[in-house]
């Protein structure tokens, strides 16, 4: 059921047909956010499967709200188009690139970097539950980890829906490590058969990476096509816990 808060924000609650919600917002609503008091993992999973980015906010007191976002303009690209700079290639020899080994650490590092403004505790709890149960979900939450030895230098949290991967939040701790992590992520997604890399809100660095901007209707069309296609999970070589980042960038994997 769709209702309105005092400021004209749509209020949504599970069960909700999230594809129909996305269509309604596209046709009738010029802004980007809905709101809900529900952080149920099933609901967050359904929102991700419809192309929303799950965010959260607080009213300054005890009230916590899920604020699903469906951007009016979205930054997207095909992973094969990721720009790999000379600097990224040179620095990549220092690092390994892994997946799903340190989800909790990556999430904590994102909060330490960006604060709790939208990464509210109930949202993080939902993400942790969705990661723990990812094999039983429509969408698969994941962490990407760029490490120098055991040191976690950069990483991100994202979610797979079919052959679409959406980057949700990330961090870096060393100069240049974020550039290497994004380049390695692009190469990993390409090798895994991901057709659409959704980078969310347009920012300058995403354009440098190779992304372009699309309207909300264009995004939903691209997202739904990719969602219905399968992507493979590329695993590290036998006996290894991660990929050499340089090998990913050089397309040796």
Model-identified regions with their sequence ranges:
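N-acyltransferase acceptor-side catalytic subdomain
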Residues: 1-253
């Amino acid at each position: 059921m769709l209702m309105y808060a005092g400021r004209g924000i749509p209020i949504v609650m599970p069960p909700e047909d999230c594809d129909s919600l996305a269509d309604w917002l596209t046709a009738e609503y010029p802004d980007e956010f809905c709101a809900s008091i529900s952080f149920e993992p099933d609901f967050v999973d359904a929102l991700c499967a419809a192309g929303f980015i799950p965010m959260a906010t607080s009213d300054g007191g005890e009230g916590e709200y899920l604020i699903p976002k469906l951007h009016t303009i979205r930054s997207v690209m095909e992973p094969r188009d990721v720009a790999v700079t000379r600097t990224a290639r040179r620095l990549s020899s220092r690092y390994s690139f892994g997946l799903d080994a340190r989800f909790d650490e990556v999430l904590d590092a994102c909060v330490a970097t960006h604060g709790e403004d939208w990464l509210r505790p109930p949202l993080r709890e939902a993400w942790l539950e969705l990661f723990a149960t990812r094999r039983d979900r429509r969408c698969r939450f994941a962490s990407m980890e760029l490490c120098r030895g055991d040191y976690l230098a950069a990483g991100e949290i994202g979610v797979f829906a079919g052959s679409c991967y959406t980057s949700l939040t990330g961090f870096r701790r060393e100069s240049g490590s974020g550039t290497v992590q994004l380049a390695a992520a692009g190469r990993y997604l390409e090798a895994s058969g991901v057709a659409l890399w959704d980078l969310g809100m347009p920012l300058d660095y995403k354009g440098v990476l190779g992304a372009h901007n699309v309207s909300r209707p264009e995004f939903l069309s691209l997202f739904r096509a990719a969602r219905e296609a399968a992507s493979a999970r590329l695993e590290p070589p036998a006996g290894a816990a991660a990929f050499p980042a340089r090998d990913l960038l050089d397309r040796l994997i």
